[in-house]
C-alpha cells in the first residue's frame, strides 16, 4: 500500500495474494494499492491474485502506477455460498448481471484521477475485467489518460508459462519468459466511464464477450496499430452513455457486431465511431441469427 505524496519502485518481485478481497472500490485486498498523490513503478515482476474482488493493481485519487515488463494475473475462486454471502463490499462484488457477463475479479481498477500505464506486459483476468475504470474523473478535468497501454497482451482467460507443444490464443515474452494466454471465461477486456479517456497502442486484446465498454458520453478510447478479438461484440456503449471510439491502423475480428449502442433513460449521450485504415472481419460462427453488423442499436437491458 503506497500513499501520501510518495514515489515507490517495485523491482523483480513475485507477489501472490490469495483469498477474497474486501472492496475493490476502496482498494481493500488489492495486491498493489496506490492512492492520494503517489507515483509507483513496477518493473520485471509477476503479480498473481486469487479470490473474489481480489484486484491486482488498484489506482485511486491522483496517483499513477506504471507497470513495465510484467505479468498481472487475477483469478476467480469458487467460494461456497456462505463465504460469498458474507462478503459485503460497499458496491459490487461481481460484474453487473445486466451486462450479460459473469465474473468476480478485475485485474486492474482505476478510480478518480488515477492513471495506470502498462508497457510490454500481460494483463489477464479469468472473469469480469482486465483493464477497468470505475467512478473516474473526466479527462476534461485531468488532461491525462486513465489507462495507457502499450505493446501488451490483455484479455479474459488463463495464463501460464508457455509449453512448446501447446497452442495458445496469444503469447507474450515478458522479462525473458514466454507466457501463453488462453481465452476463456466471461467478461470485458477494458472499460471507460465518467468521462475518462484511454489510449491503447500496439496491443492485442481478446474477449469471449466484449473488448470494451464505454459508459459515458464524454469518455473516449483510442486504438492504434492494434489487434482486437471478440467472440460476441467488439465494443458496446452502456445505457446509451455514448462516447468516442477511434480505431486507427488496426485489425478486428468479431462475430456478431463491431459496435452495439444500447438505449437507456439514465444517460442521453451520443456515440461517435471513427474507423480509420482498419480492417473489420466478421469471421467465425455467430451464436445468434443476426451478425456481421457494423453498428447495432438495441434496447438496453441495463436501464
What are these model-predicted stretches?
Residues 6, 38-46, 67-71, 120:
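Parallel beta-helix/beta-solenoid
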Residues 7-36, 61, 72-111, 127-191, ...:
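Acidic/polar low-complexity surface segments
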Residues 13-18, 45-47, 52-53:
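N-terminal extracellular ligand-recognition/capping segment immediately after the signal peptide
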Residues 37-38, 51, 114, 226, ...:
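Periodic glycine anchor positions in long extracellular repeat architectures
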Residues 57-58, 62-68:
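Hydrophobic or amphipathic alpha-helical targeting/insertion segments
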Amino acid at each position: 500500500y503506497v500513499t501520501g505524496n510518495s514515489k515507490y519502485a517495485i523491482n523483480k518481485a513475485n507477489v501472490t495474494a490469495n483469498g477474497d478481497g474486501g472492496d475493490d472500490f476502496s482498494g481493500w485486498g488489492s495486491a498493489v494499492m496506490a492512492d492520494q498523490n503517489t507515483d509507483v513503478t513496477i518493473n520485471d515482476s509477476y503479480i498473481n491474485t486469487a479470490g473474489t474482488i481480489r484486484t491486482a493493481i488498484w489506482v485511486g485519487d491522483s496517483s499513477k502506477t506504471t507497470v513495465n515488463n510484467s505479468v498481472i494475473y487475477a483469478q476467480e475462486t469458487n467460494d461456497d455460498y456462505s463465504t460469498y454471502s458474507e462478503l459485503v463490499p460497499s458496491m459490487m462484488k461481481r460484474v453487473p448481471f445486466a451486462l450479460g457477463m459473469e465474473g468476480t475479479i478485475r485485474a486492474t481498477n482505476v478510480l478518480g484521477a488515477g492513471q495506470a500505464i502498462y508497457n510490454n506486459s500481460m494483463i489477464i483476468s479469468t472473469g469480469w475485467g482486465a483493464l477497468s475504470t470505475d467512478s473516474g474523473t473526466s479527462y476534461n478535468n485531468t488532461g491525462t489518460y486513465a489507462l495507457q497501454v502499450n505493446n501488451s497482451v490483455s484479455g479474459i482467460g488463463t495464463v501460464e508459462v508457455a509449453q512448446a507443444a501447446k497452442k495458445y490464443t496469444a503469447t507474450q515474452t515478458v522479462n525473458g519468459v514466454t507466457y501463453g494466454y488462453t481465452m476463456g471465461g466471461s467478461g470485458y477486456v477494458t472499460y471507460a466511464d465518467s468521462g475518462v479517456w484511454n489510449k491503447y497502442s500496439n496491443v492485442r486484446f481478446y474477449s469471449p464477450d466484449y473488448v470494451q465498454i464505454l459508459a459515458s458520453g464524454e469518455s473516449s478510447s483510442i486504438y492504434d496499430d492494434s489487434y482486437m478479438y471478440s467472440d460476441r461484440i467488439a465494443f458496446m456503449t452502456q445505457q446509451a452513455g455514448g462516447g468516442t471510439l477511434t480505431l486507427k491502423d488496426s485489425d478486428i475480428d468479431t462475430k456478431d457486431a463491431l459496435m452495439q449502442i444500447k438505449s437507456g433513460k439514465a444517460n442521453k449521450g451520443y456515440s461517435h465511431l471513427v474507423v480509420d485504415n482498419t480492417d473489420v472481419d466478421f469471421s467465425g460462427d455467430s451464436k445468434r441469427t443476426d451478425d456481421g453488423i457494423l453498428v447495432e442499436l438495441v434496447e438496453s437491458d441495463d436501464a
